[in-house]
Amino acid sequence: MTNIRKTHPLMKIVNSSFIDLPAPSNISSWWNFGSLLGICLILQILTGLFLAMHYTSDTMTAFSSVTHICRDVNYGWLIRYLHANGASMFFICLFMHVGRGLYYGSYLFMETWNIGVLLLFAVMATAFMGYVLPWGQMSFWGATVITNLLSAIPYIGTELVEWIWGGFSVDKATLTRFFAFHFIMPFIIAALAGVHLLFLHETGSNNPSGLSSDTDKIPFHPYYTIKDILGMLVLILMLSLLVLFSPDLLGDPDNYTPANPLNTPPHIKPEWYFLFAYAILRSIPNKLGGVLALVFSILILALIPFLHTSKQRSMMFRPMSQCLFWLLVADLLTLTWIGGQPVEHPFITIGQLASILYFLLILVLMPLTSLMENSMLKW
């Protein structure tokens, strides 16, 4: 008799995705981040659901409702900090996942990659809206500054911003709609992740060598299920250490002050995972130019498959490209640091140089280096 997991309509889908899925035998721990992102998403949906039971999306009570969750709700502090720091872990996994894709040439699976870029935008939008909800000083001013960027769009900018605000400033209408969108977006992200997986399973996974692994496949279960569980344990350990020992390490102290439209904080900055893009935005003196650079800094990922000039897929056997990749990583870390600094000398100059280098590396230096490596191989 055939096993039920191979015949039952629902079990069949699970079986072909997580049990009998043929996987390359040599994929490293860099391939763990997909499953870790799934765990992060589930954690965020669950903790978010419990937070939403106690949160009120009204400007008068939002801040005190978050305080109430932390002080009066059973383990409310734990749920709140798991949610806030879970977002940080989510972005760490996201950046690692994208970095893996860049290094090993996974972006040549075009459909999977483009849905991944769409997912990145969706997660960033969700995180931004979530940061507004506690209605602290940085929530309010972050929302004001970031939504105001849309006013740089010619002709329709001002009307668009007021339409998003639901008035003439960030107020009750803005908070209510941000809460509604923040609640629905994770489910849209989950659906997109399903499509992401669907396209991935059409082609099968890439592997560190970048070569075809059709001749050497192993079943996903038990090999990679066990491997993924190890990754999950490490993730849970790191998140637990963060939540239980220093839950406010990655937050902003200004957000413990209730929102006050009459008092601007000295340094308005987003959460750490947006600082690299914020630094690129600030490095351009022109408002529209800054907004375009900000959008393009993420959208540039969609161009990467077209900028692939190497005869090899992976960077595993390309030492010169590897150097440029790690230079890009260092550049992004520099941008992250600059984004959190005040706008003054020498940070302005460093930010401008790092921003130029970011676009130069991706658009010019990496494709040219790949061509040079091709000629060195006499191809």
UniProtKB/Swiss-Prot annotation:
Record keywords: Electron transport, Heme, Iron, Membrane, Metal-binding, Mitochondrion, Mitochondrion inner membrane, Respiratory chain, Transmembrane, Transmembrane helix, Transport, Ubiquinone
Location of the protein in the cell: Mitochondrion inner membrane
InterPro entries according to UniProt: Cyt_b/b6_C, Cyt_b/b6_C_sf, Cyt_b/b6_N, Cytb/b6-like_sf, Cytochrome_b, Cytochrome_b_C_euk/bac, Cytochrome_b_N_euk/bac, Di-haem_cyt_TM
Pfam families for this protein: Cytochrom_B_C, Cytochrome_B
Chief location: mitochondrion
One example GO MF annotation: metal ion binding
Membrane in keyword set: yes
One of the GO biological process terms: mitochondrial electron transport, ubiquinol to cytochrome c
Source organism, top-level taxon: Eukaryota
Binding site for a ubiquinone: 201
Residue numbers binding heme b b562: 83, 182
Cofactor: heme b
SUPFAM superfamilies referenced in this protein's UniProt entry, alphabetically: a domain/subunit of cytochrome bc1 complex (Ubiquinol-cytochrome c reductase) (SSF81648), Transmembrane di-heme cytochromes (SSF81342)
Bilayer-crossing regions: 33-53, 77-98, 113-133, 178-198, 226-246, 288-308, 320-340, 347-367
Entry binding sites for heme b b566: 97, 196
Function: Component of the ubiquinol-cytochrome c reductase complex (complex III or cytochrome b-c1 complex) that is part of the mitochondrial respiratory chain. The b-c1 complex mediates electron transfer from ubiquinol to cytochrome c. Contributes to the generation of a proton gradient across the mitochondrial membrane that is then used for ATP synthesis.
Family, similarity comment: Belongs to the cytochrome b family.
Subunit field text: The cytochrome bc1 complex contains 11 subunits: 3 respiratory subunits (MT-CYB, CYC1 and UQCRFS1), 2 core proteins (UQCRC1 and UQCRC2) and 6 low-molecular weight proteins (UQCRH/QCR6, UQCRB/QCR7, UQCRQ/QCR8, UQCR10/QCR9, UQCR11/QCR10 and a cleavage product of UQCRFS1). This cytochrome bc1 complex then forms a dimer.
Name the record gives this protein: Cytochrome b
Gene: MT-CYB
